[in-house]
């Protein structure tokens, strides 16, 4: 996967010093950012020109000590044709030699008012997300009480209907049917809709519903982290379901483990309310309140008390 320089400009604010149509279409293929400190001193053994070249105060200060043609010759090496974009942070002055080198190599030259470390972090985060490998899973992705919930289950079990009911109850839809899942960092999984299905829910017997048109902009969300999975399955009295909540299961997507809650579905059960309760219970556990442990402690105390009474 790749991100064009134009995509970068569309998402992050910069002051454009130099660009051309062809330069804006250059592709960024890595989220690693290059700060050419040693290169400005003439050491190019491990130079990686295909990365974004970011000039901070240190690189800029050294560059300004080099004068005349030497500065231009040095910048020509740093600003190679393979380089997608060069960015100068902290609104530092851009010398004419840098503009000339950008024109010669047809590289977009940008200026940012952000501090270098902050800009580095913003760029890396954006590129990590955009360049991450996508996996498609079947389900409904919702933001419920601020928790990213992926609702899965057999076809026809009522995932979309549950999602619609949750939207009516004030929660936000991210994706229905097809969810594009990607690993945002080593421990975080995120999901987003396919562009053609954005803001849409399919309800059997009704058809395609545009959630944003019917319920407003507050009922949809572009993407969310996936904090938990709720799996809907048909009720089977022969099957043992977790009744205490002390036997959580884990599912794995793209090497990231996500806790899963399995909910049996049968006539008369209000699935959307049960999903809300499961999410609130999940949040409570994250905050250190575990109803299962409280119950077990009470049961242990009761057993101990009964033994002492005998």
UniProtKB/Swiss-Prot annotation:
Residues 201-210 are annotated as: Important for the catalytic mechanism of both phosphorylation and dephosphorylation. It is an enzyme of class 2 (transferase). InterPro entries: HPr(Ser)_kin/Pase (IPR003755), Hpr_kin/Pase_C (IPR011104), Hpr_kin/Pase_Hpr_N (IPR011126), P-loop_NTPase (IPR027417), Ser_kin/Pase_Hpr-like_N_sf (IPR028979). This is HPr kinase/phosphorylase. Coiled coil: none annotated. The Walker A ATP-binding motif also binds Pi and PPi. It comes from the Bacteria. Catalyzes the ATP- as well as the pyrophosphate-dependent phosphorylation of a specific serine residue in HPr, a phosphocarrier protein of the phosphoenolpyruvate-dependent sugar phosphotransferase system (PTS). HprK/P also catalyzes the pyrophosphate-producing, inorganic phosphate-dependent dephosphorylation (phosphorolysis) of seryl-phosphorylated HPr (P-Ser-HPr). Its EC number is 2.7.11.-, 2.7.4.-. CDD domains: HprK_C. HAMAP family: HPr_kinase (MF_01249). NCBIfam families: hpr-ser. Its cofactor is Mg(2+). It comes from Lactococcus lactis subsp. cremoris (strain SK11). The keyword Kinase applies. Keywords: ATP-binding, Carbohydrate metabolism, Kinase, Magnesium, Metal-binding, Multifunctional enzyme, Nucleotide-binding, Serine/threonine-protein kinase, Transferase. The active site is at residues 138, 159, 177, 243. GO terms for molecular function: ATP binding; magnesium ion binding; phosphorelay sensor kinase activity; protein serine/threonine kinase activity; protein serine/threonine/tyrosine kinase activity. Homohexamer. Residues 264-269 are annotated as: Important for the catalytic mechanism of dephosphorylation. Mg(2+) binds at residues 160, 202. It catalyses: [HPr protein]-L-serine + ATP = [HPr protein]-O-phospho-L-serine + ADP + H(+); [HPr protein]-O-phospho-L-serine + phosphate + H(+) = [HPr protein]-L-serine + diphosphate. Transmembrane segments: none annotated. GO terms for biological process: regulation of carbohydrate metabolic process.
């Amino acid at each position: 996967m790749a991100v064009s320089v134009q995509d970068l400009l569309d998402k992050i604010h910069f002051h454009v010093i130099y660009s051309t149509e062809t330069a804006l279409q250059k592709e960024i293929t890595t989220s690693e950012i290059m700060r050419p400190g040693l290169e400005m001193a003439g050491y190019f053994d491990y130079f990686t020109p295909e990365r974004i070249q970011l000039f901070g105060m240190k690189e800029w200060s050294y560059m300004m000590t080099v004068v005349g043609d030497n500065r231009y010759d040095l910048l020509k090496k740093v600003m190679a044709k393979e380089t997608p974009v060069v960015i100068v942070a902290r609104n530092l002055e851009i010398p004419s030699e840098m503009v000339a080198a950008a024109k010669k190599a047809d590289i977009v030259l940008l200026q940012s008012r952000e501090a270098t470390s902050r800009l580095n972090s913003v760029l890396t985060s954006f590129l990590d997300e955009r360049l991450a490998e996508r996996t498609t899973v079947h389900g409904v992705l919702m933001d419920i009480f601020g928790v990213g919930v992926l609702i899965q289950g057999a076809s026809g079990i009522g995932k979309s209907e549950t999602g619609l009911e949750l939207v009516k109850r004030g929660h936000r839809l991210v994706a229905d049917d097809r969810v594009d899942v990607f690993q945002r960092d080593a421990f975080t999984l995120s999901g987003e809709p396919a562009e053609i299905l954005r803001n849409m829910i399919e309800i059997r017997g009704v058809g395609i519903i545009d959630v944003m048109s019917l319920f407003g902009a507050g009922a949809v969300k572009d993407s969310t982290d996936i904090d938990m999975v709720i799996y809907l399955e048909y009720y089977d009295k022969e099957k043992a379901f977790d009744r205490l909540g002390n036997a959580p299961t884990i599912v794995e997507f793209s090497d990231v483990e996500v806790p899963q809650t399995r909910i049996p579905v049968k006539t008369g059960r209000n699935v959307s309310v049960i999903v809300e309760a499961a999410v609130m219970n999940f949040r409570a556990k994250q905050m250190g309140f575990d109803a299962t442990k409280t119950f077990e402690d009470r049961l242990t105390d009761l057993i101990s008390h009964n033994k002492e009474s005998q």
